[in-house]
Each structure stands twice: as C-alpha cells, then as structure tokens.
Amino acid sequence: AGFVFDLSDGRSLEIKVAISAVDKEGALLNLKKETQGKNFDKVLAEAKSKWNKAVSSISVNGTEEVKELFYTSLYRTLIHPSVYMDVDGRYRGIDHSIHNAEHFTNYTIFSLWDTFRALHPLINLIDANKSKDMMESIMAHQGQSIHKALPVWSHMGNENWCMIGYHGVSSVSYTHLRA
C-alpha cells in the first residue's frame, strides 16, 4: 500500500498507528483506547508524565552531570521488561495461543541472565506492583511452556534459549521472599 499527501501549503499531517500481537481488532482497540480524542502533543505529554513518574521513584543528589547520567541510566534500565498485551488484556503466549492476563499486566523481554542480579531487585524496591506483575508474567510463561520452564530469555511470545543458567528461579524466589 502506498499513500501520497500534498503538504505543499504548509499543513501538517498527523498519523496514528497501533500494534497488537493478537490481531487487527486488538490493534484497533489499542488505538482507540490509547489515542481517541488526543493529538500528538497530548500523547507526548502523557508519555513524558509517565516516564517522569517512573524515574522520580529514586532521588539523587549531585552535579547536574551526575544527575543526568543517573536518570538516563535509570530510564534505560526501566525500558524492559515491556508491557506485552492489548488494552483488553489479551496477549500471545509462549505457546503461541491467545491468553488473557487477568489481574496482572503481562510483560515480555526478560533477559534474566542480564537482569536477575540487579534489575529485578531494583524493580521490587521501587515498584512492587510492577514487580508482582513481572513475576505473574514469568509464571504464565512457565505454565505455557512446552517444557514447563521459567523463561531463560523471553521475547515477545518466544523463548530464545540464548543464555546459560536458569535465573528465573532466582528472580521468582527473591520476589516471593520480599512479598
């Protein structure tokens, strides 16, 4: 498909897009729920507000350079795991079937070999609800796995099996003990 727009008179063009790992109806519902009645500036302001809330969970002192380094690192730390579900709770599981995340937000991109030592304990300290949802997601992965295994390197409804070890056990155990 192709589109041609004549913007020679200086008008701007605003395009809204949405995705779903489930189906096109999910993408359309996501688009409606997340952007209906909002222009680009409104969506941008909401995103900035959410990120400011997330990074303000920790307060640091120091020079502006030190603060910039810290908060940039914290922002990058919090990008993943990512929400992996439609606004109605549906998501494509590790078994490639459609599931409904009831009573939790489903997350993906668990690089547990990289994150079990620091990221998961940090999330547990600064956002206990997100930590709980991440553990629910890990346990859902285990329930959907043909091997009944916790994730090793879970990515968008797939298991990459690309790291050594079984660090999901440490993450789940730590969170359970902290609850």
Residue spans for each PLM region:
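Beta-sandwich/jelly-roll carbohydrate-recognition scaffolds of carbohydrate-active enzymes
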Residues: A1-Y107, A140
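Helix-terminus loop motifs that line ligand-binding clefts
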Residues: Y91-D95, H99-N100, K130-Y174
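Secondary-structure capping and boundary motifs in well-ordered enzyme cores
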Residues: E65-V66, T105-D114, N160-G168
